[in-house]
Amino acid sequence: MTDKRKDGSGKLLYCSFCGKSQHEVRKLIAGPSVYICDECVDLCNDIIREEIKEVSPHRDRSSLPTPHEIRHHLDDYVIGQEPAKKVLAVAVYNHYKRLRNGDTSNGIELGKSNILLIGPTGSGKTLLAETLARLLDVPFTMADATTLTEAGYVGEDVENIIQKLLQKCDYDVQKAQRGIVYIDEIDKISRKSDNPSITRDVSGEGVQQALLKLIEGTIAAVPPQGGRKHPQQEFLQVDTSKILFICGGAFAGLDKVIGQRINTGSGIGFGAVVKGQSEKATEGELLSQVEPEDLIKFGLIPEFIGRLPVVATLSELSEDALIQILKEPKNALTKQYQALFSLEGVELEFRDEALTAIAKKAMARKTGARGLRSIVEGALLDTMYDLPSMDSVEKVVVDESVIAGQSAPMLIYGQPEAQASGE
């Protein structure tokens, strides 16, 4: 096609689609007895782009990463926790393979595999869920189980979780139905005692009951604005059977429950087998042996445990693992701060003894990887405050004494400052 303003007879030309004359548009492209303007070309491109967006979920499903690929991607961002990564990779792959095949295979209905993550604070539960969502390019939202109450009580309804997921994808129901929901602090909604209580437990067992249908799969009616304040609005129908739910919690004390079960029958008195200190299992080793009966004793109701068939346990991070977290992942904390300082034209160096000191401090605080950022932020706060007002600083060096609070980071100046100090 060629760009023409007039035909051979000098006649004024018009766009065959919108009817605008050649003087009202920038370009008029001619074909055999037909013309199209640049504005209509742009409009056609927009229409095509929208259609591509609509079919993109199907394209994504056909290119579902394998469990090995999922595991390798997790390795780039999450240090350690190898058993949990393997469990997650298989569970996530099977979930999206199930969606791709329409919940059935050769007439056999495929069950839903929601996931329960058990591990101490700062061990990487949330990071694993976030990283999976980024890899699969699906909507992701987080909810805090401690804020949830069953319907009719002051607090957040469980349906609001789906409303948050819809917000993340501009209320596109099809996208939301392929999303991932991470519910944190799930251990905090455990039943307050082993026996059913006479008084209503609206934030414990009541929330577990409210979450049952949502996690298993139901058609949730969600208003675009959320909550119960806009009853006149048309509700969106969301099929939660296609949403992957990942629940996580520290489950403090669960190791003792597991230990009691394992040691039952070992006997007491003269015939008992006395275990030495070296034979005692660590918390991580005990958690890896968790059984449904242990979770029931901890306070989760059997029906709720049944909706979370895939269980992955995470161990407490060691000092070496924390040092690796500081420097090895793609978005490692030290790399983030180095990128931040580079925006000021300054190089930032963390010495090895500084990384060890940061890890030791985090271990002492018992906050896992979550506490690393606050330690680094505290050590660099004054420097980040002063640096934009300073000239000729080329490099900032952080050593062990900086982390201990005994000295400020070392500032290395460039040539102009060196000359000035020499004079």
UniProtKB/Swiss-Prot annotation:
GO terms for cellular component: HslUV protease complex. Belongs to the ClpX chaperone family. Signal peptide: none annotated. Residues 2-56 form the ClpX-type ZB domain. ATP-dependent specificity component of the Clp protease. It directs the protease to specific substrates. Can perform chaperone functions in the absence of ClpP. One of its GO terms (molecular function) is ATP hydrolysis activity. This is ATP-dependent Clp protease ATP-binding subunit ClpX. It comes from the Bacteria. Keywords: ATP-binding, Chaperone, Metal-binding, Nucleotide-binding, Zinc. NCBIfam families: clpX (TIGR00382), PRK05342.1 (NF003745). Zn(2+) binds at C15, C18, C37, C40. ATP binds at P120, T121, G122, S123, G124, K125, T126, L127. The gene is clpX. InterPro entries: AAA+_ATPase, ATP-dep_Clp_protease_ClpX, ATPase_AAA_core, Clp_ATPase_C, Clp_protease_ATP-bd_su_ClpX, ClpX_bact, P-loop_NTPase, Znf_CppX_C4. HAMAP family: ClpX. Transmembrane segments: none annotated.
